[in-house]
A protein has these predicted regions:
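N-terminal Rossmann-like NAD(P)+-binding domain of SDR-like oxidoreductases, especially those catalyzing
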Residues: 1-174
Length: 174
């Protein structure tokens, strides 16, 4: 099972649709989203009855939401798309960016570490159950933004993953 945090936003929704359309593996996807200004439950109208899709309204700034979803679903992978976005908003109202993008992600990481520590190293069974999760198979993926690299003029080469971070707004710094 894959837990997609912040999956009702633009990028998260597109990831969910792409994953559900994948023919190679059919794995349950649970989306947790707080449905703030950028999250839209209507994005999922066409898949709301898909047996591999579940939506839970929750917030990474609320530790009990994270604890509950980890206990109930025991994900193999967690992909965090949740973030307050938009450079201009981060300059005029940085508090919500700090709350979600820093404290919320910290809460998520803290509870994921606790969850990870409860997982077995790996299975001794030759044929593991389909939903088996171990320390060896668990993954946490944090989605970010190209804004972390700062500004780029048209004469400069494209950024690569090796470029140093040079955030220039509360959004990109968070």
């Amino acid at each position: 099972m894959i837990l997609v945090i912040g999956g009702a936003g633009f990028i998260g929704t597109n990831f969910v649709f792409r994953k559900l359309q994948s023919t190679s593996d059919k794995e349950e996807i649970v989306v947790m989203d707080s449905l703030t200004y950028s999250g839209n439950l209507d994005n999922f109208k066409s898949i709301k009855n898909n047996k591999f899709f579940t939506f839970i309204q929750g917030d990474i700034t609320k530790e009990e939401d994270i604890e509950n979803i980890l206990k109930k679903y025991r994900p193999r992978s967690i992909i965090n798309f949740a973030a307050e976005t938009h450079v201009d908003r981060s300059i005029t109202s940085p508090d919500i960016f700090i709350q979600t993008n820093i404290i919320g992600v910290y809460n998520l990481l803290k509870h994921c570490l606790n969850y990870y520590q409860t997982l077995p190293q790996e299975s001794n069974e030759k044929h593991q159950p389909e939903n088996f999760v171990s320390k060896k198979t668990f993954r946490f993926i944090q989605i970010s933004t190209d804004e972390v690299y700062g500004s780029l003029s048209s004469s400069e080469p494209s950024f690569t993953e090796d470029h140093p971070f040079r955030p220039n707004s509360p959004y990109s710094a968070s």
